[in-house]
Amino acid sequence: MIVYGGGASEDGEGGGVVLKKGPWTVAEDETLAAYVREYGEGNWNSVQKKTWLARCGKSCRLRWANHLRPNLRKGSFTPEEERLIIQLHSQLGNKWARMAAQLPGRTDNEIKNYWNTRLKRFQRQGLPLYPPEYSQNNHQQQMYPQQPSSPLPSQTPASSFTFPLLQPPSLCPKRCYNTAFSPKASYISSPTNFLVSSPTFLHTHSSLSSYQSTNPVYSMKHELSSNQIPYSASLGVYQVSKFSDNGDCNQNLNTGLHTNTCQLLEDLMEEAEALADSFRAPKRRQIMAALEDNNNNNNFFSGGFGHRVSSNSLCSLQGLTPKEDESLQMNTMQDEDITKLLDWGSESEEISNGQSSVITTENNLVLDDHQFAFLFPVDDDTNNLPGIC
């Protein structure tokens, strides 16, 4: 007998409730069944308080599960149940409660008793515990355990990827970089040159291209709507777009972006013109020096022109290459110098007027074609530069 404290005896003296152990009587079974029909399964510790049954909660639970359940099945296991027990044991091992859940009406204690009895019998006879098909499956599961399948990485939209070169430029002031004129400073200060020469940009651009080729799902294909203004620098390298549909805010941002773009392009044009002027000045000085040297030479057209011209002036003339993008002022100045040279040649007393043929230009200048044609190829348009190669 077990004394369960907290209660009071019939004679009024303090004491505990005496819990009963051992076999259950028919009256106790009927009391427990009536409690389950009224309150349902569970909360077995309240059975004693509500029915004054002198049994603990664990004893009530086991009595109901193993003996009093309506769907409880008694007797030996059927061949189908035995086959299922063997299959489940080969997969789960000694998980008796999980095996009992697969066998309605059977308790985990019954399944455990059946397996232990079978195990001892097969060990005495030297027989395998599992049939060949179950043994092979069990061996394969031990050799190659099932790994939890890792979920596929979520496919993030391409627009959520952030690349430094795909971000819109910040609305910085006009002179946000060094504009001091020098070949090195201008090349470094130019955003376009910086992007082209930066190895970080080349690496990012190549990585992005390879990433798009291997992953077509992430290929970035954006279609610009009517209120989206693309921003592009020279060489088509730095390309960004503003994707927003927020009315006035979007309009203000696009206006500021367009203004910043125009200012940046103006700065680039100014630096390009300054750089071009720096390279034109030495060429212009070489031409003027050559013309002055030729004017000082009295025998310019006599005895063969190629032998009279000094080596320095000839090299300077041969090193010149006409460019189509020179300014109109440069062309006018050179035309005036050539006209002076031709005027001087027409007034020279050493021009031969013998058997050689002469050429009359639009300015009524008479020249010897043998002495003049090999230096300057004559063109109908006198405003064009002579083809010096």
From Swiss-Prot:
Alphabetized InterPro entries for the sequence: Homeodomain-like_sf, Myb_dom, SANT/Myb
A Pfam family assignment: Myb_DNA-binding
DNA-binding region ranges: 44-68, 96-119
Summary of the tissues where the protein is detected: Accumulates in pollen grains and pollen tube. Mostly expressed in mature pollen grains, and, to a lower extent, in inflorescences and siliques.
SMART domains the record matches: SANT
Chief localization: nucleus
Region of interest (Disordered), ranges: 131-159
Database matches in CDD domains: SANT
Keyword Chaperone on entry: no
PROSITE patterns xrefs: HTH_MYB
Ranges for domain HTH myb-type: 16-68, 69-123
One GO cellular component, as annotated: pollen tube
Biased composition (Low complexity): 140-159
SUPFAM superfamilies to which the protein is assigned, alphabetical: Homeodomain-like (SSF46689)
Recorded phenotype for the gene knockout or disruption: The triple mutant myb97 myb101 myb120 is impaired in pollen tube growth arrest and subsequent sperm cell release in the female gametophyte thus leading to a drastically reduced fertility. Altered pollen tube-specific gene expression.
Functional description taken from the UniProt entry: Transcription activator. Binds to 5'-CAACTGTC-3' and/or 5'-TAACAAA-3' motif in target gene promoter to promote their expression. Together with MYB101 and MYB120, functions as a male factor that controls pollen tube-synergid interaction in fertilization. Required for pollen tube growth arrest and sperm cell release in the female gametophyte, probably via the regulation of pollen tube-specific gene expression.
Record's protein name: Transcription factor MYB97
Species the sequence originates in: Arabidopsis thaliana (Mouse-ear cress)
Gene: MYB97
